[in-house]
């Protein structure tokens, strides 16, 4: 399977944010997207996730599972917000996402306790999400990536609020996903430690 971006452009209001962005990622490959604030990193991820229509160009899958035409159907999107209900427990939040997303063809997610263990927080899944620190909340949002299988991970500043040990833990999750043949696109201001990752620097436009 290959994730293809072909001549993508996008606008914010009347302003063109980026133009003619193209890349191809095969199974087991990662792309790290860098650039200053306002360069369009988050917008690019939203276009890839199918949350925003591009001004031009297209996103497509090549040699993907039968019946799946757009990457959004096979993607996890982790944005700046963690997409968890503060009043629900961690376990309830992860259960919702596991059931809502289900598994894509070619793999299966792991159990809730196992996922919480993978992010180092198995002993607090009974707590309301809102009780957790910012770093713990981000770790639990990462657990959402592994309770339901999606071959494509689209990650916006994934290590925000994480300490050094959690950074390493996250890098391990990504490495395991790539080893399974997954694809990762991550926008960041910080080094992510993805061995062998491709890179895309976005500069934006001066208006």
UniProtKB/Swiss-Prot annotation:
Q: Name one GO molecular function term.
A: ATP binding
Look up keyword Signal and say if it applies: no
Which E.C. number(s) belong to this protein?
A: 7.6.2.5
Q: Which UniProt keywords apply?
A: ATP-binding, Cell inner membrane, Cell membrane, Cytochrome c-type biogenesis, Membrane, Nucleotide-binding, Translocase, Transport
What residues bind ATP, as annotated?
35-42
Question: Which InterPro entries does the entry mention?
Answer: AAA+_ATPase, ABC_transporter-like_ATP-bd, ABC_transporter-like_CS, ABC_transptr_haem_export_CcmA, P-loop_NTPase
Predominant place of localization? membrane
Cellular localization per UniProt: Cell inner membrane
SMART domains reported in the protein's UniProt record: AAA
Q: Which residues form a coiled coil?
A: none
Main EC class the enzyme belongs to: translocase
* Top-level taxonomic group: Bacteria
GO BP terms, alphabetized: cytochrome complex assembly
Q: Which GO terms describe its cellular component?
A: plasma membrane
* Topological relation to the membrane, as annotated: Peripheral membrane protein
SUPFAM superfamilies referenced in this protein's UniProt entry, alphabetically: P-loop containing nucleoside triphosphate hydrolases
What reaction is this protein's catalytic activity?
heme b(in) + ATP + H2O = heme b(out) + ADP + phosphate + H(+)
**One Pfam assignment:** ABC_tran
Domain (ABC transporter) spans 3-206
Q: How does it assemble?
A: The complex is composed of two ATP-binding proteins (CcmA) and two transmembrane proteins (CcmB).
The family annotation for this protein states: Belongs to the ABC transporter superfamily. CcmA exporter (TC 3.A.1.107) family.
Q: What is this protein called?
A: Cytochrome c biogenesis ATP-binding export protein CcmA
Organism, by scientific name, is Rhizobium meliloti (strain 1021) (Ensifer meliloti)
Q: Could you tell me the gene encoding this protein?
A: ccmA
């Amino acid at each position: 399977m290959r994730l293809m971006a072909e001549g993508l452009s996008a606008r914010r209001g009347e302003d063109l944010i980026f133009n003619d962005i193209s890349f191809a990622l095969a199974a087991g490959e990662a792309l790290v997207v860098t650039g200053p604030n306002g360069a369009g990193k988050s917008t690019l991820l939203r276009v890839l996730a199918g949350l925003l229509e591009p001004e031009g160009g297209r996103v497509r899958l090549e040699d993907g599972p039968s019946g799946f035409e757009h990457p959004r159907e096979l993607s996890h999107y982790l944005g700046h917000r963690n997409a968890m209900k503060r009043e629900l427990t961690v376990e309830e939040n992860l259960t919702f996402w596991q059931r809502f997303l289900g598994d894509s063809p070619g793999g299966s997610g792991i159990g809730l306790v196992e996922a919480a263990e993978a992010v180092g927080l198995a002993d607090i899944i009974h707590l309301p999400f809102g009780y957790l620190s910012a770093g713990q909340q981000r770790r639990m949002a990462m657990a959402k990536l592994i309770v339901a299988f999606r071959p494509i991970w689209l990650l916006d500043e994934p290590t925000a609020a994480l300490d050094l040990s959690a950074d390493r833990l996250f890098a391990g999750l990504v490495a395991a996903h790539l080893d399974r043949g997954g694809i990762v696109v991550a926008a960041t201001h910080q080094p992510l430690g993805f061995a062998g990752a491709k890179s895309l620097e976005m500069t934006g436009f001066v208006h």
